[in-house]
């Protein structure tokens, strides 16, 4: 695997009963790259992400990660996380009865649950929440936050996991323009730190604004991969 590549998927196929969801798909993510993943509903975007993160198994192919000896198989989202992959799905998967701060740390510091407050959070986590304008909600229960705020909290949690690869599954669908811009600022900072980002979106204008490359799926096939700067403006 090339030195600048953080993630590589080769010849990945996945079949559900009566449906060929992915057919011999290749995908490469470079370090410090924001890579858009686009396609119509049913194209295979969600399946690709779920194969990568261990939600689904796959029939053929291999996944390679920077720093791993040989191919990896993620049998669960927890294994994917151990390999340095953090994912934020469109449907937020957090604990509504815990505070924002507790959700940021859950799964890593279980002894602190029920004791975490704004003052116990480390400087990095504090700065991260501030950058997304959710610092004032740190001691609020998640269920008291809007859907958009919950999405930003899920993004903050994923970023705080110190990942090599960050997968954002349509993260802007519930955000307003100001929140989208704050997210893009954060994505650019992560890019500068060498994090590879997979950005699933239906909005081509957002691809022009923040992405380096784009991969297009159709009916389970990869139909094109292009540098964004070479795309015609439409």
Model-predicted segments: where are they?
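Glycine-rich phosphate-binding loops of nucleotide-dependent enzymes
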Residues: 2-234
């Amino acid at each position: 695997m090339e030195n600048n590549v953080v993630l590589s998927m080769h010849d990945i196929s996945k079949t559900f009963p009566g449906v060929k969801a992915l057919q011999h798909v290749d995908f490469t993510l470079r370090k410090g790259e924001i890579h858009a993943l686009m396609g119509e509903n049913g194209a295979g975007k969600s399946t690709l992400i779920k194969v990568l993160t261990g939600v689904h198994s796959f029939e053929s192919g291999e996944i390679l990660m920077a720093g791993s000896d040989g191919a990896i198989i993620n049998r669960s989202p927890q294994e994917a996380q151990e390999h340095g992959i953090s994912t934020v799905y469109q449907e937020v998967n957090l604990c509504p009865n815990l505070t924002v701060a507790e959700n940021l740390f859950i799964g890593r510091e279980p002894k602190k649950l029920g004791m975490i407050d704004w003052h116990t959070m480390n400087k990095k986590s504090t700065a991260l929440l501030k950058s997304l304008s959710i610092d004032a909600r740190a001691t609020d229960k998640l269920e008291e936050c809007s859907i958009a705020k919950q999405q930003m909290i899920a993004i903050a949690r994923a970023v705080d996991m110190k990942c090599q690869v960050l997968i954002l599954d349509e993260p802007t669908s519930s955000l307003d323009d100001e929140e989208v811009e704050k997210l893009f600022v954060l994505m650019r900072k992560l890019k500068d730190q060498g994090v590879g980002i997979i950005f699933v979106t239906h909005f081509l204008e957002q691809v022009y604004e923040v992405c380096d490359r784009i991969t297009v799926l159709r009916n389970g096939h990869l139909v094109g991969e292009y540098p964004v700067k070479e795309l015609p403006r439409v």
